[in-house]
Amino acid sequence: MRPFAYFERLSQAFHDYPSLSKILVVSTISGGGLIVYSEANPSYSNNGVETKTRKRKVVLLGTGWAGASFLKTLNNSSYEVQVISPRNYFAFTPLLPSVTCGTVEARSVVEPIRNIARKQNVEMSFLEAECFKIDPGSKKVYCRSKQGVNSKGKKEFDVDYDYLVIATGAQSNTFNIPGVEENCHFLKEVEDAQRIRSTVIDSFEKASLPGLNEQERKRMLHFVVVGGGPTGVEFASELHDFVNEDLVKLYPKAKNLVQITLLEAADHILTMFDKRITEFAEEKFTRDGIDVKLGSMVVKVNDKEISAKTKAGEVSTIPYGMIVWSTGIGTRPVIKDFMKQIGQGNRRALATDEWLRVEGCDNIYALGDCATINQRKVMEDIAAIFKKADKENSGTLTMKEFHEVMSDICDRYPQVELYLKSKGMHGITDLLKQAQAENGSNKSVELDIEELKSALCQVDSQVKLLPATGQVAAQQGTYLAKCFDRMEVCEKNPEGPIRIRGEGRHRFRPFRYRHLGQFAPLGGEQTAAQLPGDWVSIGHSSQWLWYSVYASKQVSWRTRVLVVSDWMRRFIFGRDSSRI
């Protein structure tokens, strides 16, 4: 009863002294108002703290492999990240050929970028717009929204930055061949895959209408794929399976009219794969009835025919119903304009250093298909390397000095390590022994600059451009995000190799691409796999490896479940041919 008696006495006090209740109410309201005011209007001292600790603004252009990987990995609260892209999702592009034929649904391979960018300790925001100009002088990017805006809104706007990360990817390369842009389908985006799927169904529906002769039906059902790379080969395989496993059951009269042709300008398809895979793929396509025309270069395309020229100079005309163009990548207009501004107008892609920093722009980075690493060559810096290593200025290097400098060289120039592996050498000592043996010199305890040149003269042969794949872009995004996370620490304590043409060390270790292997689905539940160590596998077992790897590489559990369920649905019910 004590609590009740207490409240009874308190109530009696308010009743006997009304002014007491008024004072309490006024105090409560005033106190709450002060709290609200203090939150809405922080003190001048707080403003001073915020100014001192202003977050550095990172603008990221693009939501592809490089951009999504950068967002997922970045974990430093000192940055404010602004993502700008015309698409508000990340697409798992290796499965786009599967989307074209309904093996996998389009929504199963996309993840909203806001889900990826949503982090508790990193401030991130997204703008659905396309960047059309980069101004490195004023540190601004100019963007254009594709959304409708109200009377107060602006369709074009600019965004300033402290750091700019360019990950816009690339566009399909038409090589300025007449008619390609107007008459061909590309396979770079999810929308491209959806259009191809709709066109395939349209072709079968049109060919089923009465009043057409057989020649016109054959033309409508003739599907041409230009490009014998991984994308073109996989699409041709998917289309073949879609036609023979599903569509011929629904369109039985079209069974003997369908034809798939693959045009490749080189002497073989899948030239980036092992020779065993190339030969197997060509033999399988022949068995499947896919007409592979090697050494055929497209010269012209109109609305019903495609013209191709052989290496002998003979030009043939092929009637078609649909063309899928998959011959390589080209530079986007915004990147071309930016390259002209910074003196790279004659290049095909943005040139960066080994730290993915655009050459000539300290605060701008580029990764993925829009850029290429301009790897410095050892022989270009050989004099500076020797001078840096010769600490006693004696004109020769001792074995100790040689090994010390080679350790830094291996960090700075990845081609050295690649050369050692290609020659089966176990270390730097083997490289030196080989050079001495070739020159007929004795095994001396010191070497001069000419002997150093002789030892390293062949290593630059391993300098190669990285392939334009999602695997490379993803690794670059992860690498750059980790560099940003450790930027403050590495400013004080550099972790990179020694500066050959300067003092001190680089802040970070340079980017190193680690090739994890590649797949080439060939249809009929058969896949070719090429993994590091010259390991090649072809057949049904590799197909199951492909399933497991691609499922594990999804960016979220949502897409992982959707993709696997689509595969199961296809196994049970087949592919959907509805046009919706």
From Swiss-Prot:
Tissue expression, as annotated, is: Expressed at low levels in seedlings, roots, stems, buds and flowers and, to a lower extent, in leaves and cotyledons.
Topological category with respect to the lipid bilayer = Peripheral membrane protein
The UniProt keyword set, sorted, is:
Calcium, FAD, Flavoprotein, Membrane, Metal-binding, Mitochondrion, Mitochondrion inner membrane, NAD, NADP, Oxidoreductase, Peroxisome, Transit peptide
What is the required cofactor set for this protein?
A: FAD
Example GO CC term: the record gives: mitochondrion
Q: Any idea which positions bind Ca(2+)?
A: 390, 394, 396, 401
Under Gene3D superfamilies, the record lists: 3.50.50.100
**Which residues are the transit peptide here?**
1-38
Q: Which residues bind FAD?
A: 57-87
Q: Which reaction does it catalyse?
A: a quinone + NADH + H(+) = a quinol + NAD(+); a ubiquinone + NADH + H(+) = a ubiquinol + NAD(+)
Return the SMART domains for the record: EFh
- Which cysteine pairs are covalently linked by disulfides here? none
Q: Which GO terms describe its molecular function?
A: calcium ion binding; NADH:ubiquinone reductase (non-electrogenic) activity; oxidoreductase activity
- What family does this belong to? Belongs to the NADH dehydrogenase family.
Role summary: Alternative NADH-ubiquinone oxidoreductase which catalyzes the oxidation of mitochondrial NADH does not translocate protons across the inner mitochondrial membrane.
Its name, as the record gives it, is External alternative NAD(P)H-ubiquinone oxidoreductase B3, mitochondrial
